[in-house]
Amino acid sequence: MVEMLLLTRILLVGFICALLVSSGLTCGPGRGIGKRRHPKKLTPLAYKQFIPNVAEKTLGASGRYEGKITRNSERFKELTPNYNPDIIFKDEENTGADRLMTQRCKDKLNALAISVMNQWPGVKLRVTEGWDEDGHHSEESLHYEGRAVDITTSDRDRSKYGMLARLAVEAGFDWVYYESKAHIHCSVKAENSVAAKSGGCFPGSATVHLEHGGTKLVKDLSPGDRVLAADADGRLLYSDFLTFLDRMDSSRKLFYVIETRQPRARLLLTAAHLLFVAPQHNQSEATGSTSGQALFASNVKPGQRVYVLGEGGQQLLPASVHSVSLREEASGAYAPLTAQGTILINRVLASCYAVIEEHSWAHWAFAPFRLAQGLLAALCPDGAIPTAATTTTGIHWYSRLLYRIGSWVLDGDALHPLGMVAPAS
């Protein structure tokens, strides 16, 4: 207990110091963490435009239809009423059905209501259609699941609808369509779909290389393990495993499958996790440099090159990505953190970080945590360091803290939309 209190105090002091230092480190040109953000210029959507520019029920938008919800179905408990006084519900059926929606839809709608009042003082958000129990929409409409709403402004000024659609995009709806001159259509992903795609993790079946030889499943890592990683220059080294930033035992997740041929490798990781990609210029020989860019797994494309452990196990080789696909696994999801901030998973070099597409920023943000771990290891005898964090299910508290701060100080588009599931409000 004393050690845990010491750890917490060290982390808090270190984190505060880091924030104070950031104001001095980010005053130069370019977008810095401590730099004041200017309001982003919003462009209204054009009539019949939809964002993202894919079909509504595809993976890149709101996802597939999962079945109609009725008042007698088991899934009816997934719907929650929205009594926000800043939203006007038309409720032409006079049943309150338009107020029922999924929690994700409710959260986005409430955020949009605030934006509408800020954009047009005296004007409120108006919902004309929400959950549909009467079959008035097309087959497999997301209205039947409480995942879609049709909206206008309270003054019904159609000249505002293009900007209303843009505000809906900014509020976080997964698909927004300027469907009709009379309304805007918005929809969201299913709750279980968001959870399955979110986070920055590897499957429990992934393996790491240990310092004393052999491999180990990532889910079995424990404090004291030293695993193969690489420094900023691509030199291989063994680094201490510190904790899991996220741990979901036996959960079902949707992973991106990155495959290479020369050398042959296959890595599974979630959309928001970072993977190092080599520079694009041609190289006839391996340079062993990791000076390439860290990209979200969802942004890696065939033809780009990732770093793979060579056959002799002595160096990293840039290997061309042969294919990128999606696969669902139920072996759990794990995000190991090493002192180096990198790790070789299934012989492929990856970052330990996710959510923000800046490996160096993320590694810097975890400096107070690494410092605390180092001090605690020096102050406590062997075996006395608390290990509960490595076995606790869910997202590490320090990661949650950084995510909250990042959401506050960074532009919304700097964070991966599937980086972390927002807690229900």
UniProtKB/Swiss-Prot annotation:
Ca(2+) 2 binds at E93, E129, D132, D134. Induction: By retinoic acid. Transmembrane segments: none annotated. SUPFAM superfamilies: Hedgehog/DD-peptidase, Hedgehog/intein (Hint) domain. The keyword Glycoprotein applies. A lipid is attached at G200 (Cholesterol glycine ester). Residues 1-26 form the signal peptide. The record marks G200, C201 as: Cleavage. The record marks D246 as: Involved in cholesterol transfer. InterPro entries: Hedgehog (IPR001657), Hedgehog_Hint (IPR001767), Hedgehog_sig/DD-Pept_Zn-bd_sf (IPR009045), Hedgehog_Signaling (IPR050387), Hedgehog_signalling_dom (IPR000320), Hint_dom_C (IPR003586), Hint_dom_N (IPR003587), Hint_dom_sf (IPR036844). Its EC number is 3.1.-.-. Glycans are attached at N282. The record marks T270 as: Involved in auto-cleavage. Expressed in the posterior limb bud mesenchyme, the Hensen node, the notochord, and the floor plate of the neural tube. One of its GO terms (cellular component) is endoplasmic reticulum. It comes from the Eukaryota. It is an enzyme of class 3 (hydrolase). Ca(2+) 1 binds at E92, E93, D98, T128, E129. Belongs to the hedgehog family. Interacts with HHATL/GUP1 which negatively regulates HHAT-mediated palmitoylation of the SHH N-terminus. Interacts with BOC and CDON. Interacts with HHIP. Interacts with DISP1 via its cholesterol anchor. Interacts with SCUBE2. This is Sonic hedgehog protein. It comes from Gallus gallus. The gene is SHH.
